[in-house]
Amino acid sequence: MRTPAQFLGILLLWFPGIKCDIKMTQSPSSMYASLGERVTISCKASQDINSYLTWFQQKPGKSPKTLLYRANRLVDGVPSRFSGSGSGQDFSLTISSLEYEDMGIYYCLQYDEFPLTFGAGTKLELKR
């Protein structure tokens, strides 16, 4: 009789294309910045996701707002002070000149593969 570990080994050999969920690592987890300051948030994928990355802004009690898609494409109506860059595994969101309304939590999301996975978020607060 085979043990569960042996069955798992056989399954992994049988299905070489099986992948783990893509992990998205955001940094920093929180930051304080002054008005007018340039702010950059990073997001790293555990594997190549091409440019299939979206950035969201979340404010308390409100629905998430999509800022950029395909890593660097600005959604209509989003101010041009927001920009995105990167491809493959390393991405960043930059706010060129911080405004008060930019405070909130920012999330990256990969949509290269299912299940879609989010970064843990970056809380952006005003430096006093």
Swiss-Prot record:
Keyword Cell division: no
Source organism, top-level taxon: Eukaryota
Region listing for Framework-2, in residue ranges: 55-69
InterPro entries: Ig-like_dom, Ig-like_dom_sf, Ig-like_fold, Ig_sub, Ig_V-set, IgV_Light_Chain
Cysteines engaged in disulfide bonds, as pairs: C43-C108
UniProt region (Framework-4), positions on chain: 118-127
Complementarity-determining-1: annotated segments: 44-54
Complementarity-determining-2: annotated segments: 70-76
Region described as Framework-1: spans on this chain: 21-43
A cellular component annotation (GO) from this entry: immunoglobulin complex
GO BP terms, alphabetized: adaptive immune response; immune response
Keyword terms: Adaptive immunity, Disulfide bond, Immunity, Immunoglobulin, Signal
PROSITE patterns found in the cross-reference section: IG_LIKE (PS50835)
Positions of the UniProt region annotated as Complementarity-determining-3: 109-117
Residues covered by region (Framework-3): 77-108
Signal sequence coordinates: 1-20
Name of the protein described by the UniProt record: Ig kappa chain V-V region T1
Lineage: Eukaryota, Metazoa, Chordata, Craniata, Vertebrata
